């Protein structure tokens, strides 16, 4: 096996992609593992996913503005959690499971 530098830990989306490749695309997983391209691919997916998440959250906040945080803290938290769940759903579907 090739020597790979594992200095940067994988985040949530990188780990999700790893599990997806192992379970759903084992031939691609093994090829990438043997070629030494798996770790860079997982890091790239992770960076792309976080960029998409940030961009999607911004778009959703523009489309669905949050209530005033000072007056309605619980509503604001619920609203932001809902938007984050929607954004994560998009990221997982479009980036991780493709």
What do these predicted ranges mean?
Residues 1-36:
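Short N-terminal mixed-charge amphipathic segments
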Residues 33, 40, 71-74:
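Short coil/turn segments at secondary-structure junctions
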Residues 41, 50:
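Metallocofactor- and cofactor-centric catalytic cores in central/energy metabolism, strongly enriched
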Residues 45:
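Core catalytic machinery and nucleic-acid-binding channels of phosphodiester-processing enzymes
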Residues 58-98:
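C-terminal charged interaction modules
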């Amino acid at each position: 096996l090739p020597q790979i530098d594992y200095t940067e830990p994988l985040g949530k989306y990188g780990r999700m992609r790893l599990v997806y490749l192992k379970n759903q695309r084992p031939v691609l997983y093994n090829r990438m593992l043997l070629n030494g391209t798996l770790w860079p691919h997982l890091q790239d997916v992770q960076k792309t996913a976080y960029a998409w998440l940030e961009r999607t959250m911004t778009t959703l906040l523009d489309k669905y503005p949050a209530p005033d945080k000072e007056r309605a803290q619980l509503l604001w938290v619920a609203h932001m959690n809902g938007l984050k769940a929607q954004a994560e759903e998009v990221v997982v579907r479009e980036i991780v499971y493709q």
